[in-house]
C-alpha cells in the first residue's frame, strides 16, 4: 500500500455484527428499544426474554410471580411476538434469541411472524441459543430431562438445516460456563464436549440424511466469554478455532475448509463487573473486547457488550448506547480491520495455544471415558468441578491473591458521578405483571379453542411419537397456543428435571473463617443442636452460583445446610424451613424480583407461625430496595460488594444469635406477664 494512499482506499475487513442484548417489560416497549438501537448503528438484534418465557410459563402462573418482564421481554403468544418485531423487517435482520428449553417454541413464533411479513424462510438469518446442556451446569433455565431436551435441540437443527438454511440452530455457550467459574480449559473442553454430544445425536438419528451432515456442522456456532486475562483469552479463542477444525476433520470427516470454520459470537465477562467503583467496569469491558477482536484468525462474528452498571441492576438505554459506541469506535476509528492476524508468528502465543489444546484434549478424553457430556452432567461431575473452580476464584479474591481494583485493592476513591441522581439503573414497574396477566386472559378469550385443542393434541402426538417437534409447534403458534400451554403439554410428556447442585465438595476458605466457626459452635451448645440454614432460590432465577457458594461456605464453617437448587415457590421454601427447623433462611434472587418474592416468603412464614425465623437476602439489590426489604422484616441484605464469604458467615451466625436472644427475652417477658409480650398457645409454644 502506498504511503500516500488515502484512508478511503485502504482495504478493510468487514466488521463484526454489533449487537446489544436487550428486552424488558412488554413486547411494545422492547420494540421501541430495538428500533432505537438500530437507528443508533446497531447491526443485529439480540433478544433477552424474561424467565417465564424461558421456562415455559404464562405470566399468570404461580412461578411467574414477580418475574414477568424483569430480565427480558415477556412473550406469551403470537400476538406478543408480532408486537416485538413490528416495523422491523425480519428478512433483512440478523436476530439472536437467547432461548434454550423453549427454543423450538420461540423459533416457531418467530417463523410465524416472518411468514406474516412475507419473508421467505430461506432468507431468514439469526441464531437460537438452544444449548440446553449448559443450562444444567450454569444458567438454570432447563425444563425437561437431558434426553428429551437433547431431542428437542436435534429437532430444531434438523428443521432449520432443511427449511431455514441461513439460521444458526444452536449456539454452544461457553459464555455461561465462565460465568459459573470455569477455567479456560474447562470452558474449552466442556463446550466442545457439548457440541460433540449434540452432533453425535444428530448424526445417529435414523431419519437423518448423512449427505447433509457437513451443512449441519457448518451451522453450529458458539457463544463465548472473554475475561480480564486477555492474552490467555486470545490464546483460548485461537485454541477453540484450531480444536474445532481438528474435530471436524478427525471425528466427522468434514473436508470442506469453509464448513470447518469456527464461528462465534461473544458477550464479554459480566461476572467480573463490580458494584464498587462501577466506573472501572468501562475499562474492563473494553479490555475484554480486545481479546475477541484483535486476532483476525479467531475474531468474533458478532459482539455484544454488557453495560458498566450491570452489577447494580438493569442498564438504561444510554448505558447500552455507551457499550455500543465502544464497538463502533474500535471497528471504525482504528486500523484494526486493515491487517492480517497480528499475532501470527508469536512464539509466546503459539506456546500458550498449544498448552491449552493439549490440556483440553486430555479433559475431553476424561469426559468421553465418563460417557460423554450428557452422562457427565447427569452424574453431577461437571457441575461439581465448576462449583469448585468458582470457590477457588472467590477465595483468591478474598485473600487478595487475585486483585480486583476498587474491591480488594485501592478501595478509597472519589464518589462516582455516574451513580448520582436516579440510581443509575432501569427499573421495571410491578404493574407490568398485572398488565401481562390481563392481556393473556384477553388473548385466550378471543381465540378458537377448538383449533387450540387440536394443535395441542398434535403437539403431544409428535412429542410421544418422536416426530420433529417444529411443524406442530409452528401450527400451535398460528392457532393461538400460549407459551405456558406449549410448555405444560411437553411437561406432561417428558416430565421435569432437577439438576445436581454441585454442593458436595469441600470448598476453599480464605483462612478467616475461624471466627464464624467459633460463633457457630457456641450457638450449637446453646441450641443443643447444629444451627440450621435453609438456602432458597425463589422464583425462576436460575443463576445459582451465589447460592451454591454460600451453601458451600456455610457448611464448611459448621452450619447444617439445606439447599435444594433453583426454582422454588415461596410455599416450598417455607415448608422446607418448617421441616428442617431452620434457624435462618437465606434467599438468593438475581433476577430483580426480590421485592415481590421476599414479600410472599415473609407472608407465608407468618401464616406458618415461623415469622420468628430470620430471613437474609442476597442479590443485585439497589439501596432503595434494600430499605424496602428491611421494612418488610428482612434482617440483612447482601449485594455483589459483599464478596468476603467468611464475613457473611459471621453475619449469619450473629443473625441467629440475635434471634435467639430476642426469643429468650420474649419468653422471659411472657413468663413475667409483661404487657404486650408474646402469648402462649394451648401447647405452650410461643405465638409470634
Curated annotation (Swiss-Prot):
Disruption phenotype: Cells lacking this gene lose the ability to grow on C1 (methanol and methylamine) and C2 (ethanol and ethylamine) compounds, and also on beta-hydroxybutyrate, but they grow normally on pyruvate. Growth on C1 and C2 compounds is restored by addition of glyoxylate or glycolate, indicating that these mutants are unable to convert acetyl-CoA into glyoxylate. Keywords: Cobalamin, Cobalt, Isomerase, Metal-binding. It catalyses: (2R)-ethylmalonyl-CoA = (2S)-methylsuccinyl-CoA. One of its GO terms (molecular function) is methylmalonyl-CoA mutase activity. It comes from the Bacteria. Adenosylcob(III)alamin binds at residue 543. Coiled coil: none annotated. Residues 530-659 form the B12-binding domain. Its EC number is 5.4.99.63. InterPro entries: Acid_CoA_mut_C, Cbl-dep_enz_cat, Cobalamin-bd, Cobalamin-bd_sf, MeMalonylCoA_mutase_a/b_cat, MMCoA_mutase_a_cat. It is an enzyme of class 5 (isomerase). Its cofactor is adenosylcob(III)alamin. Induction: Up-regulated during growth on ethylamine. Residues 666-688 are annotated as: Disordered. Belongs to the methylmalonyl-CoA mutase family. PANTHER family: COENZYME B12-DEPENDENT MUTASE, METHYLMALONYL-COA MUTASE, MITOCHONDRIAL-RELATED. Radical enzyme that catalyzes the transformation of (2R)-ethylmalonyl-CoA to (2S)-methylsuccinyl-CoA. Is involved in the ethylmalonyl-CoA pathway for acetyl-CoA assimilation required for M.extorquens growth on one- and two-carbon compounds such as ethylamine, methanol or ethanol as sole carbon source. This enzyme acts as a regulatory metabolic control point in this pathway, that allows M.extorquens to efficiently restore metabolic balance when challenged with a sudden change in the growth substrate. This is Ethylmalonyl-CoA mutase. The lineage of its organism: Bacteria, Pseudomonadati, Pseudomonadota, Alphaproteobacteria, Hyphomicrobiales. The gene is ecm.
Amino acid at each position: 500500500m502506498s504511503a500516500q494512499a488515502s484512508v478511503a482506499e485502504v482495504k478493510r475487513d468487514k466488521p463484526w455484527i454489533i449487537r446489544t442484548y436487550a428486552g424488558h417489560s412488554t413486547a411494545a416497549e422492547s420494540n421501541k428499544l430495538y428500533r432505537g438501537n438500530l437507528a443508533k448503528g446497531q447491526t443485529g438484534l439480540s433478544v433477552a426474554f424474561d424467565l417465564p418465557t424461558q421456562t415455559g410459563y404464562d405470566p399468570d402462573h404461580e412461578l411467574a410471580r414477580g418475574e414477568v418482564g424483569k430480565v427480558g421481554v415477556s412473550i406469551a403468544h403470537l400476538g406478543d411476538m408480532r408486537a416485538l418485531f413490528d416495523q422491523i423487517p425480519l428478512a433483512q435482520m440478523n436476530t439472536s434469541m437467547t432461548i434454550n428449553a423453549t427454543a423450538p417454541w420461540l423459533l416457531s413464533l418467530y417463523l410465524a411472524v416472518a411468514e406474516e411479513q412475507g419473508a421467505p424462510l430461506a432468507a431468514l438469518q439469526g441464531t437460537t441459543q438452544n444449548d440446553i446442556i449448559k443450562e444444567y451446569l450454569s444458567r438454570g433455565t432447563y425444563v425437561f430431562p437431558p434426553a428429551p431436551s437433547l431431542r428437542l435441540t436435534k429437532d430444531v437443527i434438523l428443521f432449520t438445516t432443511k427449511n431455514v438454511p441461513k439460521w444458526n440452530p444452536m449456539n454452544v455457550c461457553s459464555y455461561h460456563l465462565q460465568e459459573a467459574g470455569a477455567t479456560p480449559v474447562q470452558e474449552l473442553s466442556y463446550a466442545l464436549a457439548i457440541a460433540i454430544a449434540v452432533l453425535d445425536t444428530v448424526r445417529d438419528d435414523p431419519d437423518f440424511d448423512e449427505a447433509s451432515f457437513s451443512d449441519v456442522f457448518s451451522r453450529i456456532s458458539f457463544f463465548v466469554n472473554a475475561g480480564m486475562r486477555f492474552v490467555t483469552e486470545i490464546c483460548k479463542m485461537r485454541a477453540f478455532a484450531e480444536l474445532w477444525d481438528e474435530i471436524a476433520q478427525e471425528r466427522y470427516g468434514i473436508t470442506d475448509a469453509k464448513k470447518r470454520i469456527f464461528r462465534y459470537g461473544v458477550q464479554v465477562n459480566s461476572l467480573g463487573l463490580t458494584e464498587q467503583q462501577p466506573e472501572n467496569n468501562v475499562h474492563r469491558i473494553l479490555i475484554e473486547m480486545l481479546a475477541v477482536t484483535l486476532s483476525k484468525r479467531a475474531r468474533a462474528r458478532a459482539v455484544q457488550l454488557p453495560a458498566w452498571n450491570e452489577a447494580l441492576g438493569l442498564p438504561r438505554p444510554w448505558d447500552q448506547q455507551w457499550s455500543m459506541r465502544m464497538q463502533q469506535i474500535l471497528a471504525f476509528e482504528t486500523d484494526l480491520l486493515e491487517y492480517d492476524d497480528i499475532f501470527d508468528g508469536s512464539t509466546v502465543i503459539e506456546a500458550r495455544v498449544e498448552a491449552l489444546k493439549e490440556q483440553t484434549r486430555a479433559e475431553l478424553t476424561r469426559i468421553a471415558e465418563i460417557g460423554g457430556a450428557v452422562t457427565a452432567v447427569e452424574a453431577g461431575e461437571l457441575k461439581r468441578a465448576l462449583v469448585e473452580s468458582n470457590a477457588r476464584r472467590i477465595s483468591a479474591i478474598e485473600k487478595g491473591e487475585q486483585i480486583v481494583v476498587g474491591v480488594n485493592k485501592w478501595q478509597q476513591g472519589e464518589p462516582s458521578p455516574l451513580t448520582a441522581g436516579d440510581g443509575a439503573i432501569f427499573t421495571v414497574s410491578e404493574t407490568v405483571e398485572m398488565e401481562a396477566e390481563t392481556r393473556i386472559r384477553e388473548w385466550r378469550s378471543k381465540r378458537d379453542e377448538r383449533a387450540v385443542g387440536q394443535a395441542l393434541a398434535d403437539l403431544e402426538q409428535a412429542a410421544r411419537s418422536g416426530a420433529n417437534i417444529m411443524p406442530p409447534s409452528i401450527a400451535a403458534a398460528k392457532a393461538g397456543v400460549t407459551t405456558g400451554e406449549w410448555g405444560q403439554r411437553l411437561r406432561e410428556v417428558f416430565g421435569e428435571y432437577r439438576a445436581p447442585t454441585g454442593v458436595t465438595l469441600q470448598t476453599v476458605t480464605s483462612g478467616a473463617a475461624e471466627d464464624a466457626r467459633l460463633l457457630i459452635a457456641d450457638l450449637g451448645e446453646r441450641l443443643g443442636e447444629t444451627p440450621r440454614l435453609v438456602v432458597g432460590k425463589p422464583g425462576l432465577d436460575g443463576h445459582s452460583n451465589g447460592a451454591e457458594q454460600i451453601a458451600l461456605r456455610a457448611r464448611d464453617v459448621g452450619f447444617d445446610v439445606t439447599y435444594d437448587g433453583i426454582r422454588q415457590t415461596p410455599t416450598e421454601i417455607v415448608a422446607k424451613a418448617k421441616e428442617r427447623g431452620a434457624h435462618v433462611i437465606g434467599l438468593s434472587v438475581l433476577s430483580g424480583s426480590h421485592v415481590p418474592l421476599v414479600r410472599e416468603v415473609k407472608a407465608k412464614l407468618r401464616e406458618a407461625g415461623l415469622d420468628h425465623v430470620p430471613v437474609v437476602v442476597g442479590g443485585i439489590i439497589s439501596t432503595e430496595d434494600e430499605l424496602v426489604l428491611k421494612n418488610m422484616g428482612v434482617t440483612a441484605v447482601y449485594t455483589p460488594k459483599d464478596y468476603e464469604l467468611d464475613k457473611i458467615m459471621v453475619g449469619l451466625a450473629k443473625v441467629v444469635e440475635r434471634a435467639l436472644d430476642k426469643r429468650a427475652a420474649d419468653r422471659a417477658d411472657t413468663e413475667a406477664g409483661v404487657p404486650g409480650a408474646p402469648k402462649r398457645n394451648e401447647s405452650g409454644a410461643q405465638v409470634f
